[in-house]
């Protein structure tokens, strides 16, 4: 069950001792990675809690979130990212935002952290493979970054691109997917307040294996839509190609909304295995966020537009 909308609560209403400690740890972790400017800004602003969209479900243990991952740039097995992602250098790092906009710009990752109001969002994550987690992300709304570049009326979609650096991302040396990894959203999906760019989890700086230093989180969609280690965001007029849709278009659609009524060709999507639980649980339409996002797809055939 989701708790109240953000306007109904203030940070003071919900900030307990545990959140305070995670806030402090995140600031300290950021400083430890050379983010002194960002850390100072975070200290002044505080890390706010986004209660309006956060679930009350217990978060998955951090050790599971950081050791059970899909990140094919570091290998195809679940343990590969945590074992191999240490080779990735996340500083210096820039993100180019361009395309159909009035003010294209290149942002240093530290400036993005410093210049945006960071929130903790506790979201469900449902993998297309049939397992799920609950993850306490730290990030900021994607719409805030898009607004900075002033999109034009031609901006109908948003395309995302991961870093291409085979020397540090060994999985890119193999043609498992068409590299670099690409993803996309419709513009109205991208500016929905649920969609965030994450820079941390559990109050700490985002681990490499979870998509450092910047990843997309779209909780009503299957996890592979959450592109990791982003270096480019482009506002475009036509639907962009996406990695898994290019590889297997009959199995992975562009939208990839969580839908228990639409099975993967090789397995059911009706239930899921929550990491750490024994029994399977029913999968919720839109991963339980339908009250917020279902109107985006009003009148669409969701089986055809999977």
UniProtKB/Swiss-Prot annotation:
Its main location: periplasm. GO terms for biological process: protein repair. One of its GO terms (cellular component) is periplasmic space. Keywords: Metal-binding, Molybdenum, Oxidoreductase, Periplasm, Signal. Mo-molybdopterin binds at residues 69, 72-73, 127, 162, 210, 215, 226-228. Predicted to be exported by the Tat system. The position of the signal peptide cleavage has not been experimentally proven. Binds 1 Mo-molybdopterin (Mo-MPT) cofactor per subunit. Its EC number is 1.8.5.-. Its cofactor is Mo-molybdopterin. It catalyses: L-methionyl-[protein] + a quinone + H2O = L-methionyl-(S)-S-oxide-[protein] + a quinol; L-methionyl-[protein] + a quinone + H2O = L-methionyl-(R)-S-oxide-[protein] + a quinol. It is found in: Periplasm. SUPFAM superfamilies: Oxidoreductase molybdopterin-binding domain. GO terms for molecular function: metal ion binding; molybdopterin cofactor binding; oxidoreductase activity, acting on a sulfur group of donors, quinone or similar compound as acceptor. Part of the MsrPQ system that repairs oxidized periplasmic proteins containing methionine sulfoxide residues (Met-O), using respiratory chain electrons. Thus protects these proteins from oxidative-stress damage caused by reactive species of oxygen and chlorine generated by the host defense mechanisms. MsrPQ is essential for the maintenance of envelope integrity under bleach stress, rescuing a wide series of structurally unrelated periplasmic proteins from methionine oxidation. PANTHER family: PROTEIN-METHIONINE-SULFOXIDE REDUCTASE, PROTEIN-METHIONINE-SULFOXIDE REDUCTASE CATALYTIC SUBUNIT MSRP. This is Protein-methionine-sulfoxide reductase catalytic subunit MsrP. The gene is msrP.
């Amino acid at each position: 069950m989701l708790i109240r909308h953000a306007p109904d609560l203030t940070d003071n209403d919900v900030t307990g001792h545990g959140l305070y400690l995670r806030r402090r740890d995140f600031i300290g972790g950021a400083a430890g990675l050379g983010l002194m400017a960002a850390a100072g800004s975070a200290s002044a602003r505080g890390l706010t809690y986004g209660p309006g969209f956060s679930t009350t479900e217990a978060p998955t243990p951090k050790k599971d979130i950081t050791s059970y991952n899909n990140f094919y740039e570091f290998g195809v097995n679940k343990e590969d990212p945590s074992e191999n992602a240490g080779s990735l250098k996340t500083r210096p790092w820039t993100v180019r935002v361009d395309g159909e906009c009035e003010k294209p710009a290149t942002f240093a990752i530290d400036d993005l952290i410093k210049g945006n109001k960071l929130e903790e969002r506790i979201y469900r994550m449902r993998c297309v493979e049939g397992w799920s987690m609950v993850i306490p992300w730290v990030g900021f709304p994607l719409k805030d970054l898009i607004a900075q570049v002033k999109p034009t009326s031609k901006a109908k979609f948003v395309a995302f691109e991961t870093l291409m650096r085979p020397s540090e991302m060994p999985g890119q040396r193999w043609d498992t997917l068409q590299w670099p990894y690409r993803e996309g959203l419709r513009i109205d999906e991208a500016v929905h307040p649920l969609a965030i760019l994450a820079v941390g989890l559990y109050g700490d700086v985002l681990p490499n294996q979870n998509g450092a230093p910047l990843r997309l989180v779209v909780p009503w969609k299957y996890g592979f839509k959450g592109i990791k280690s982003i270096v480019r965001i482009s506002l475009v007029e036509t639907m962009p190609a996406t990695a898994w849709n290019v590889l297997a278009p009959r199995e992975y659609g562009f939208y990839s909304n969580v839908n228990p009524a639409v099975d993967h060709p090789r397995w059911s999507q009706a239930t899921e295995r929550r990491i750490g639980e024994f029994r399977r649980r029913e999968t919720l339409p839109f991963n339980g966020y339908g009250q917020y996002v279902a109107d985006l797809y009003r009148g669409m055939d969701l089986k055809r537009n999977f």
